[in-house]
Amino acid sequence: MWEQYASEIIGTIKWFRDLDYHVLVTALAKEETNDNGGTEYWPLLPMAKVQKQLPGIFDNVLAGVRRTEDAKDEQGRAVGVRVERFIVCDQYGGWHCKVRDPLRSLQAVERTGNIADLFRKMEGKQSNKITEKDTKA
């Protein structure tokens, strides 16, 4: 029964992947401890077997990561919160991501919160360096 369920879920995912236009699928991340005590992050899906197959099904599997820290002035006083956004594009820090980038223009972790920046870089329309200015909304 569970094998059939997994097969149907994978079939549905492949159906979405094979649509005749660009498809973006989003998922929450599932944190998992591996046999060595390290933390791994997988797309959150109903079955572990299906979770681990997802990166092999799609051309691009990315993870959006947000880091916040207290911002301080020169005297060390709190002046607000600083937010940084990153997109993980490869196996890094326990994240299971990948990008099919023929130009190999992307780093394992890109400092941006905008997926369109990554696609511009892969098309060769942008320099390899994404600056702070590029990430501001």
Predicted ranges, named:
Residues M1-Y5, T39:
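Flexible beta-alpha connector loops of hexameric P-loop NTPases
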Residues Y5-T12:
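Phosphate-interacting basic helix/loop segments used at nucleotide- and nucleic-acid interfaces
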Residues W15, E31-A137:
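Conserved GTP-binding G-domain of TRAFAC-class P-loop NTPases and closely related GTPase folds
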Residues L19-V25:
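Loop/turn-to-beta-strand initiation segments
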Residues L28:
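Conserved H-loop
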